Amino acid sequence: MTVDRLTSRSRAAGUAAKIAPGDLERILATLPRDPREGERVVVGTRDNEDAAIVRVPGGKAIVQTLDFFTPIVDDPYLFGQIAAANALSDVYAMGGEPWCALNIVCFPVKELPEDILADILRGGADKVREAGAVLVGGHSIEDESIKYGLSVTGIIDPDCYATNTGLRPGDVLLLTKPLGSGVLATAVKAGWDGFEAHEQELGRWGAMLNRAGGRVIRELGLAAATDVTGFGLGGHLLEMANASNMSVHVDVSTLPLMPAVLDLVATGLLPAGSHANRHFCSGNVSVHPEVDSLLVDIVFDAQTSGGLILAVPPHLVDDACSILRAEDAPFWRIGHVEEMGEGVPRLVLQP
């Protein structure tokens, strides 16, 4: 049997397949709120949080999330790892620890060999095990388009967690993975020259757990954090700025980029989701005239299994860096938070 490349079987790859933020916002605005939320829900859907935090008996809480997507790479085992790491990331972004997970699978079992699906599931299971969680089952349907991910339950202190609403003036912003996965995934899907190297780079970063960042949140009691996924760095920073009523300033020259990303963007290679992100955010963003427009595109590039944005009070920056170094986790200082004043943009991109 001739097997197509996995990335050729879907319209969009990874988190770039998300519904555009403007469309999603309109749809969700029509849904009523459950009046019981106040009894159980510590953190819900109001501020576009990464996951929900729900009280359970005994004064404890769980953190709940779900994430799945189409292939971002052609290697099935690597795809499983990346998809699982991406789903687990939401728990880490809140300051929780993954506890158990369920598989979510869509697969054309009558068209592709079963061992491809087995490799996807094996990649996911290995990543769940690395996170210290337990895989306890799942659900599958037959579908023309391959999709895989996890529903993850984590444990969390109901009095110590990070959200989009916790930004404070002076907070320093740390980013724990480089940008550009949306661009590289588009190159892989298109079979661009050198796409095999791009796939390796996607695997290197996409399969990396955000566990070290979660440890920083817990040990230092950070109030604000998120992970960078389908709405891009700019989109997720803007969510935090809006939820916290703050202004976020990004030093674009400090942003870490995956290899070849800038060159690929210069050729016009950018996923449709990235264009949608930039358009949706444009009314709340100020771009300094000296900032390269290609870098602005990358700021809004739709990421898959991206790093955490950690908002760290100035007096805790050294401690945060020490924890990340002890975990051998990469990080970059990319900006800071300021008070929101009249005429001040929510998101400022400066050289």
Curated annotation (Swiss-Prot):
Cofactor descriptive note = Binds 1 Mg(2+) ion per monomer.
Active-site residue numbers: 15
- Enzyme class label: transferase
Gene Ontology BP annotations: selenocysteine biosynthetic process
Instruction: Return any one Pfam family short name.
Output: AIRS_C
| Binding-site residues, Mg(2+) | 50, 90, 227
- The protein's site described by Important for catalytic activity is found at 18
User: Which coenzyme or cofactor does it need?
Assistant: Mg(2+)
Reaction equations catalysed:
hydrogenselenide + ATP + H2O = selenophosphate + AMP + phosphate + 2 H(+)
Protein's UniProt keywords contain ATP-binding = yes
GO CC: one term? cytoplasm
Q: Where do the annotations place ATP binding?
A: 18, 47-49, 67, 90, 138-140
Q: Which UniProt keywords apply?
A: ATP-binding, Kinase, Magnesium, Metal-binding, Nucleotide-binding, Selenium, Selenocysteine, Transferase
Q: Which Gene3D superfamilies match?
A: PurM-like C-terminal domain, PurM-like, N-terminal domain
A GO molecular function term, named singly, is: magnesium ion binding
Record carries keyword Cytoplasm: no
Q: How does it assemble?
A: Homodimer.
Q: Which family does it belong to?
A: Belongs to the selenophosphate synthase 1 family. Class I subfamily.
What task does this protein carry out?
Answer: Synthesizes selenophosphate from selenide and ATP.
Its protein name is Selenide, water dikinase
State the species of origin. Answer: Nitratidesulfovibrio vulgaris (strain ATCC 29579 / DSM 644 / CCUG 34227 / NCIMB 8303 / VKM B-1760 / Hildenborough)
